């Protein structure tokens, strides 16, 4: 996700 850290984007919503 854009609003979150890159690391979170890995296992979060696309």
From Swiss-Prot:
Q: Which organism is it from?
A: Zea mays (Maize)
Q: What else is known?
A: On the 2D-gel the determined pI of this unknown protein is: 5.7, its MW is: 41.1 kDa.
What's the name of the protein? Answer: Unknown protein from spot 360 of 2D-PAGE of etiolated coleoptile
The protein's superkingdom reads: Eukaryota
